[in-house]
C-alpha cells in the first residue's frame, strides 16, 4: 500500500510520541508481564497496582495475553494496559481490538512500523542499532524501546545515541535491574524502563501477591530516591 492509498490516522506521529511520553513518564517502570494462567490476571495486576505500578505491558508470549488485555481493560479501567511482543500486523490488529492502549515490539520490520503509522494506538518499536533507529525515524518515529538493553550496550549505548539522534527517547528493556535502573533513569533521553524483577515466576505460581506488591513498592521507592 502506498502512502497515498494508506488511510491517514487522526493522530500524527508527533501526537503519538507525545502520548508515549505521557504513558512512560507517568509509569517510569513498565513491568513486562507474561500470563501463564488465566486466573493470575487480576490478582497479579492488583498486586502491581497496590505497589504503585499501574502501567502494564502484557506480552503475547502466552495463549492468555490477548485475554489478559481484554480483562484488564474491562475490569481494571484505572490501569494503563499495553501489549508487548507484537511481531506482525495481524498481532497488532488483534491487540488493537482487545483494547490495548499502546503497543511494544521486540524489533522492527517495515510492516510493523507501517502498522504503527496507520494505527491510532501509539507504537514503541524495539531497536538495537543506529540503522534500525533510522528506519523508524524515516517514518516519523521518535520513541523507541532499546532491546535487549544491556547486551546492546546499555547506558553507554543510549548516551552515544544521543549524539546523532538528539530528539530520540528510549525505554531500555532487557537486563534492567535494581542495581542499574537508576543509572538508566538518570539519562535525559530515557523516559522509562521495561523490566520484570518484581515478576518472579515462583511468586506468581505460588500466588505470593504480597511479595510482588512489596517488590513493586521497593522499585518505585528506588526511583523516587533518584
Swiss-Prot record:
Keywords assigned by UniProt, alphabetized: Carbohydrate metabolism, Lyase, Schiff base
Chain sites annotated for binding pyruvate: 61, 85, 145
Pathway the protein acts in: Carbohydrate acid metabolism; 2-dehydro-3-deoxy-D-gluconate degradation; D-glyceraldehyde 3-phosphate and pyruvate from 2-dehydro-3-deoxy-D-gluconate: step 2/2
Gene3D superfamilies the UniProt entry points to: Aldolase class I
InterPro entries: Aldlse_KDPG_KHG (IPR000887), Aldolase_TIM (IPR013785), KDPG/KHG_AS_1 (IPR031337), KDPG/KHG_AS_2 (IPR031338)
UniProt KW Lyase keyword: yes
Assembly and interaction partners: Homotrimer.
Family: Belongs to the KHG/KDPG aldolase family.
The name this protein goes by in its record: 2-dehydro-3-deoxy-phosphogluconate aldolase
Species for this entry: Pseudomonas putida
Gene: eda
